Amino acid sequence: LPSDLRERIESRLAIIDAREQALALPHATAVRTPTFCSGCPHNTSTHVPEGSRALGGIGCHYMATFMPERRTETFTQMGGEGVPWIGQAPFTDETHIFANLGDGTYFHSGHLAIRASIAAGVNITYKILFNDAVAMTGGQAVDGTLSVPKIVAQMAAEGASKIVVVTDEPEKYEAVRSLPQMAGIEIHHRDQLDWLQKQMRDVPGCSILIYDQTCASEKRRRRKKIVDGKPGFPDPARRVIINEAVCEGCGDCSVQSSCVSVEPLQTDLGRKRRINQSSCNKDFSCLKGFCPSFVTVEGGQLRKGVSHSADVEKAAVLPPSLHELPDPQRIAITASGNRTYGILVTGVGGTGVVTIGQLLGMAAHLEGKGVSVLDMAGLAQKGGAVFSHVQIAHRPDELFSTRIATGEADLVIGCDLVVSASNDALAKMRPAVTRAIINADVAPTSDFLRDPDWTLPAEALKRNLIDATGETATEFVDATTLAASLMGDAIYSNPMLLGYAWQKGFVPLERQALERAIELNGVSVASNLEAFLWGRRIAHDREAVAEFLDPKRLAKVVELRRPYGQSDSDPAGRIDRLIGRRVAHLTAYQNAAWASRYSEWVQRVRRVEGDRIGDSGQWRLTEAVAEGLSKLMSYKDEYEVARLHSDSAFVASIRAQFEGDWSLKFHLAPPVLSRIDPNTGVPVKREFGSWMLSAMRLLAKMKFARGKWFDPFGRTLERRTERALIGEYEVLIDELLARLAPANHELAIELARLPEQIRGFGHVKESQLVKVRVQWEDGLARWHGKPSRKRREPIPIRSIQA
């Protein structure tokens, strides 16, 4: 080979080897696995009852095979759904199975699989998931005409043993009940799905369950499309919010809804939950979580962001430095022919990542440059990782690759921290070459749906990015928070990042070309242009933007608690502040005497830990007891829930989020008034109007009765257990302090933190307590140097109310 060519090859191989070696070193990682969208019908429809399993198929519902709790196995080609059971059934003791089948696949060839199962005489229930769109590939309409009545007629003609329909809107079937094919067909609400599936699995032969609920993504698209002055799909004037003060962070709302719009919120009192209003598709299944913290706002609308205030008022308060922005000195692409300029856009599917790549591509095209845009998406559009490779050259004939090679990304626009710090993205980066603009706000992954204690190693991921690009080449922007505060919707974080990168001079395109590309895209043009402008402003003068924002309107950002073991410059001061906040909290909860009892215990622990462990222990046992005892002493009974809901701060927070004519509804399961679900044995929540605020204010004033002989709520086993736990924990503290030493300090902290795991209400809290009892007993056995013993589980709590 010629020497110059050999040198280029060796140089390229050296870059590849260096990146592979860097990625081979141990480093923190996180995976953004594709999952169902917020409000997706499959969040509910793919569940099977205890003791059953299902077979997967082609469609979004295939992702149920990723989720162990759904017990969905394998998949087939289109038209083969459920057919493997024909061969398996004669050779197993299993008597029945479910099979998932999408409506598009049904129309294509899936009905032939059902015909084969009917002919074979196997016991199987096909769940035909009718969501009115080919959702996996972009929401196209199913080829041909298809409706639930037509499916019913065809399945009846094929000889199905039983046909039922499940839907989130049973009332819409009143109009078709008179059709001959619908005669005798049962229509059930989706809340009855578990009970109904238990009935269906006992039906001999091939039965059909049609689950009718419109695709969540398609609902969102249709609502945005205005037809005759109205949304193309009904958009209820209703929003779900969570009173974080009431929330226990148990995660039952995520269990019930499997919705990624239910996000973690770290607070001084632990991890809670909040609803991401920007991504919520108004499915409302989260309301089934057995928790009194859920409130719906009926009527009104979300307040617009700060930037949408009146132009005159806005101009008057906008800092002078943000009025006229200078154009940056941009990177120029010359006709050198050596290499293209590679921009890698990373993020979460369904949030507009591909759109950013398209805007860059169109802007380059408008300037007459050579450009290639390659989107790596697939199933990733459903909440997974998405990459858009944008290659820009001076002329089209200088493009030689559509994909950015290893170490060849000049700019990374990271719309999501997790995806940006993945190995696939890090491999494209190289120190002294790559610049990165990264969204520092973290969206939870699908792991959070199954693990309420899920924590992302955010700082470690940021370190990975800095190592891959160089100490000064990566900039982090709280884009989601800023977009929600400035624009009223977090969806505008991506064009905001694009504007930020452009103002920094890292995008080799004219501003006018990018703005024209946004106009040609034709979607929320004014808002996207505004977001692009705000990104430029943030890049130019971040402090001025912070001054412009009203702190009361700024979306709440709370840092995660300091990791245990990490040094603290002022541990004693931190403990003082923690105790002070908890004393104030318990005083408001009950009275000063109650708070004094708490303070005496914590100060006693502090003295003993100081004497035996010293400052080297960072007062971590004191911190654990301060948080654990506070949690047990402020158990959320009827008085406390009433106090927290009627607190003026909660109502003020709603006023800050909503405008117009709105009212509140509370979703509760109060004693006596709630019926018991015969299928689950759990009280069913009911709606109560705004008048409940007055009742709650009155009930909150009766907290003096808490624990007294005349306490009408204190006689239930649940309340007696909560009060007894306080005494048990104080006994535990005594045991820990009696033998505390450096050798068992970590075990003492582990035991002292057990109350943090006792979360939730009613049966949810009971299940957590059962697990904690086992850990408690095992930990005490280790504390006393004995083999662990399995403690008899406590008597189940029967009187359960939320």
Placement of each model-derived feature along the sequence:
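Short beta-alpha connecting loops at secondary-structure transitions
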Residues: 69-73, 133-148, 175-185, 228-245, ...
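Active-site cofactor/cluster-binding pocket
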Residues: 146-149, 162, 296, 301-345, ...
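Active-site loops and adjacent core secondary-structure elements that bind or stabilize anionic groups
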Residues: 515-521, 525-802
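Thiamine diphosphate
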Residues: 1-150, 192-195, 305, 313-316, 320-430, ...
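Iron-sulfur cluster-binding cysteine motifs and their immediate structural context
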Residues: 211-214, 219-220, 225-228, 248-306
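Glycine-rich ThDP/TPP pyrophosphate-binding loop and its adjacent helix/strand module
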Residues: 133-229, 522
